[in-house]
């Protein structure tokens, strides 16, 4: 469990430093951040968020459990100090869906940085019947996507504790109905984030969107022994992993290209240059981790 907390903490540290430091190259040239941003994000606090949010519930859309957990998100944000917007919407499959959105005002009120994670959950029957939902499912969605919700709450709290006014206005969005409801559904997923996008006021520029979905992994990652999971499925994880010894994966048949390695090296170098050398973040924050 400690390694899981460590992975969450490392991901969150990279996320917060990347987002704060890379939004405007003008900021990079004209204003240096302090060597250490105090307070720092807490991996332990993020893990507590995850455990408290999950609470043994199955958060499928249009259920009491879903409504209870989104109310919990709202209450947590209000305790932190945010004014919270409830974005209600309906679809063919959902009569009572709701996004929860918190705002951190910036110097530019019409230029937004949006960070999102979905609070709903779904599960399907295992292969070969993928896409079939079943009434006895009680998945808690701890990975998909309570990890995103937990870390987004931690980021929102850290930004308040930081005590500065960011250049951009920040929106922390907790989306409902992102998950596809299965092969019997009359519509696809992504409804919550779509509702948010369709209601962005005219004249507002969304400068950046970052999505936290299934956020945080331990290493090494062992591919599951499922007939539908080939080694190619893990290319994305490997592409940006911190490991230097790739033999675990190459010995298991995953083809790694020089382009993949070069991209990871290039990204690492850019992070070090911008976040550590120019903005002064601790070097341990600046790692390509996932």
Protein language model regions, located:
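Acidic/histidine-rich catalytic neighborhood of metal-dependent amide-processing enzymes
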Residues: 136-257
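Secretory targeting signatures
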Residues: 1-37, 175
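Extracellular/periplasmic catalytic domains that process cell-envelope and extracellular macromolecules
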Residues: 44-46, 93-96, 104-109, 163-168, ...
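Glycine/charged-rich beta-loop-alpha catalytic/anionic-binding loops adjacent to active sites
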Residues: 111-113, 121-138
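Acidic, glycine-rich loop-and-strand cores that form catalytic or ligand-binding grooves
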Residues: 244-288
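A non-catalytic alpha/beta surface segment that caps or lines the substrate-entry region
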Residues: 49-107, 278-290
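Structural recognition of the beta-strand scaffold that forms the well-ordered cores
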Residues: 49-52, 85-87, 100-103, 112-116, ...
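Extracytoplasmic/secreted proteins, especially bacterial periplasmic and envelope-associated proteins
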Residues: 45-52, 64-84, 147-154, 169, ...
């Amino acid at each position: 469990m400690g390694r899981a907390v460590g992975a969450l903490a490392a991901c969150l540290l990279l996320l917060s430093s990347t987002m704060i430091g890379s939004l405007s190259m003008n900021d990079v040239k004209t204003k240096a951040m302090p060597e250490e941003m105090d307070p720092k994000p807490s991996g332990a606090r993020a893990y507590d968020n995850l455990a408290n949010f999950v609470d043994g519930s199955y958060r499928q859309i249009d259920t009491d459990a879903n409504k209870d957990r989104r109310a919990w998100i709202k209450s947590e944000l209000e305790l932190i100090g945010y004014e919270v917007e409830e974005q209600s919407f309906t679809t063919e499959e959902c009569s009572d869906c709701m996004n929860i959105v918190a705002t951190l005002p910036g110097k530019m009120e019409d230029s937004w940085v949006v960070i999102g994670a979905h609070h709903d959950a779904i599960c399907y029957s295992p292969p070969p019947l993928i896409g079939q939902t079943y009434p006895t499912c009680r998945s808690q969605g701890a990975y998909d996507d309570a990890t995103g919700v937990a870390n987004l709450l931690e980021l929102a709290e850290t930004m308040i504790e930081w005590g500065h006014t960011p250049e951009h206005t920040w929106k922390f969005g907790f989306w409902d109905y992102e998950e596809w409801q299965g092969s019997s559904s009359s519509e696809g997923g992504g409804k919550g984030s779509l509702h948010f996008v369709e209601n962005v006021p005219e004249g507002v520029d969304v400068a950046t969107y970052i999505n936290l979905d299934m956020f945080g992994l331990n290493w090494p990652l062992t591919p599951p022994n499922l007939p539908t999971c080939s080694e190619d499925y893990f290319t994305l994880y490997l592409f940006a992993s911190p490991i230097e010894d790739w033999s675990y994966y190459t010995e298991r048949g995953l083809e790694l290209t020089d382009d993949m390695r070069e991209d990871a090296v290039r990204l690492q170098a850019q992070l070090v240059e911008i976040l550590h050398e120019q903005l002064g973040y601790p070097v341990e924050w600046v790692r390509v981790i996932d």
